[in-house]
Amino acid sequence: MNEAISFDLEDQGNKGRFVARLPGNSDEAEMTFSRANEKLIIVDHTGVPDSMAGQGVGKALAAHVVGFARENGTKIIPLCPFLKAQADRHPEWSDVIQG
């Protein structure tokens, strides 16, 4: 996993996205979500541009979102196939992953 990845949250209330960036790269990876309620988000999409492929950005973004959920007492419904596949590989995420 790339330790230089930085993360941001763009939260517009009922929807938003988690953004990952690499130094020296103007592209952004994202994981978009909608908020079902105060303690439940639905992640519906993960996008990693070609310029970031193979650098562990998608996996790091998934782990970041899980960490965010734990810190905030939030659960995640992974409609996004990528996040669902990552959750299946990480049973230790079951405390925040629903479905």
Description of each model-found segment:
Residues N2-L40:
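N-terminal first-folded block
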Residues T46-A53:
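A short, internal acetyl-CoA/4′-phosphopantetheine-binding micro-motif in the GNAT/acyltransferase core
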Residues G54-G67:
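Conserved acetyl-CoA-binding loop-helix of GNAT-fold acetyltransferases
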Residues H64-G99:
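C-terminal structural segments of small proteins and small subunits
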